[in-house]
């Protein structure tokens, strides 16, 4: 009897998701730290243990309550061609970006991804596209066009976030690649759990609770020396 795991994924859709979450995707995500650079400068994060606590907190009180459930909703809205829902959740998410840098990151990554997808003939002509689409909304569209399921798109988005944050930390901290991979192993189950929890949330349960990240991001706007744009 074979003990080999059986794939439940469309290989082409999986390859499309891997393309979307790749650090090589030319949208400039590497330039943004989402407040982590400021947390490093302030000494809130200074080693592997404190970085793990920071990332776990942002995942639990941020992505799980904000980006991931919104991604689930806009993935469905794209499938249904629901322009009203797309506009609502695009506006809601951008209104919850608590600093100029975080809002700029959302809008710039969204705009860059739209331009890339258009150059690849991957954006259908649709009046449902918001006027200033954010990254989450465009990521959901790209996943939908590639046949990526809602749950897989959410997990891929969370994975890309984690990988980017660890890249930031490795550049700005004396943090080695092995330490980064230990954090990946620690947080991989948390990413899966975050997707499940996000799917169970009602609309009224949504909203980030990250005052520390908001403060770090605000302070980053006037930080003297910076490697990253947020």
From Swiss-Prot:
Chief localisation class: cytoplasm
Similarity remark: Belongs to the UreF family.
Its job: Required for maturation of urease via the functional incorporation of the urease nickel metallocenter.
Protein name: Urease accessory protein UreF
Source species, domain of life: Bacteria
High-level lineage: Bacteria, Pseudomonadati, Pseudomonadota, Gammaproteobacteria, Oceanospirillales
Record flagged with keyword Chaperone: yes
Keyword set includes Phosphoprotein: no
InterPro entries registered for this protein in UniProt: UreF (IPR002639), UreF_sf (IPR038277)
Any one Gene Ontology molecular-function term assigned to this protein's record: nickel cation binding
Complexes and interactors: UreD, UreF and UreG form a complex that acts as a GTP-hydrolysis-dependent molecular chaperone, activating the urease apoprotein by helping to assemble the nickel containing metallocenter of UreC. The UreE protein probably delivers the nickel.
Pfam families for the chain: UreF (PF01730)
Cellular localisation: Cytoplasm
Keyword vocabulary terms for this entry: Chaperone, Cytoplasm, Nickel insertion
GO cellular component: cytoplasm
Species for this entry: Chromohalobacter salexigens (strain ATCC BAA-138 / DSM 3043 / CIP 106854 / NCIMB 13768 / 1H11)
């Amino acid at each position: 009897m074979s003990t080999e795991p059986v794939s439940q994924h469309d290989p082409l859709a999986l390859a499309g998701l891997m393309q979307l979450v790749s650090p090589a995707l030319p949208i400039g995500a590497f330039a943004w730290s989402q407040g982590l650079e400021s947390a490093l400068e302030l000494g809130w994060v200074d080693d592997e243990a404190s970085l793990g606590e920071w990332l776990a907190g942002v995942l639990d009180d941020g992505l799980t309550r904000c980006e991931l459930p919104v991604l689930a909703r806009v993935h469905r809205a794209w499938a249904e061609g629901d322009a009203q829902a797309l506009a609502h959740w695009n506006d809601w998410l951008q209104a919850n970006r608590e600093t100029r840098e975080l809002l700029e990151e959302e809008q710039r990554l969204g705009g860059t991804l739209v331009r890339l997808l258009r150059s690849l003939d991957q954006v259908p002509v649709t009046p449902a596209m918001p006027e200033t689409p954010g990254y989450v909304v465009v990521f959901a569209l790209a996943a939908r066009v590639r046949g990526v399921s809602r749950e897989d798109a959410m997990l891929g988005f969370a994975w890309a976030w984690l990988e980017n944050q660890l890249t930031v930390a490795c550049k700005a901290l004396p943090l080695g690649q092995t330490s980064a991979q230990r954090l990946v192993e620690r947080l991989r189950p948390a990413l899966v759990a975050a997707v499940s929890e996000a799917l169970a949330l009602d609309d009224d349960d949504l909203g980030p609770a990250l005052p520390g990240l908001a403060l770090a991001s605000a302070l980053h706007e006037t930080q003297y020396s910076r490697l990253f744009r947020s």
